[in-house]
Regions:
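C-terminal output/effector regions of signal-responsive regulators
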Residues: 136-152
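Conserved acidic segment of CheY-like receiver
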Residues: 5-17, 22-26, 36, 55
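Alpha4 helix (beta4-alpha4-beta5 surface) of REC/receiver domains from two-component response regulators
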Residues: 68, 87-104
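The C-terminal output helix
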Residues: 119-132
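C-terminal output helix
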Residues: 109-118
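Conserved phosphotransfer microenvironments
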Residues: 19, 43-44, 54-74, 88-89
Length: 152
């Protein structure tokens, strides 16, 4: 994977085993900083103070299932979100979050699937960056046109 920069990652999971495993999939040269939190409330506070490129949520969380957090992150930021849910809940959760842009992965899973989904999120994040850059350019041109029109 060749990148010009590293992706900031927020991992939200109550499982120490999962947290250790996912950290092994996030080498610093591609993913930095990596912040690990164990509950939705802490994640919400963190997201108010810092922005992240990728958010990985391993459900359930001790204070919230995690689906609402995933939806909120997608609705309020450009971060890519990976939501891991038990296989018996996958179809219901997927149907509720796909419209917001959340990528859902059923558990149990393996390291390769998580790694592949993280790469998909990186590609999606790059696409989002390109769109944001184009939008900024268009907005700047609109400002210039308005300024010229006022001068006339």
């Amino acid at each position: 994977m060749e990148l010009g920069h590293a992706y900031s990652v927020l991992v939200v999971s109550a499982s120490a085993k999962f947290n250790e495993s996912v950290r092994g999939l996030l080498p610093e040269r591609f993913y930095w900083p990596v912040t690990v939190l164990t509950d939705a409330a802490g994640a919400r506070r963190e997201l108010l103070e810092n922005s992240y490129d990728l958010v990985v949520i391993n459900t359930p969380l001790p204070d919230d299932f995690g689906m609402g957090l995933a939806i909120d992150v997608c609705a309020s930021s450009g971060a890519g979100v990976l939501l891991l849910v038990k296989s018996e809940q996958y179809n219901d959760v997927y149907a509720k979050v796909v419209g917001y842009g959340v990528i859902t992965l059923s558990k149990p899973t393996n390291r390769q699937m998580v790694a592949q989904n993280l790469r998909i999120l990186c590609a999606t994040r790059e696409r989002m960056r390109q769109m944001q850059a184009k939008q900024a350019t268009v907005e700047e041109k609109i400002k210039e046109i308005r300024l010229v029109n006022r001068a006339k």
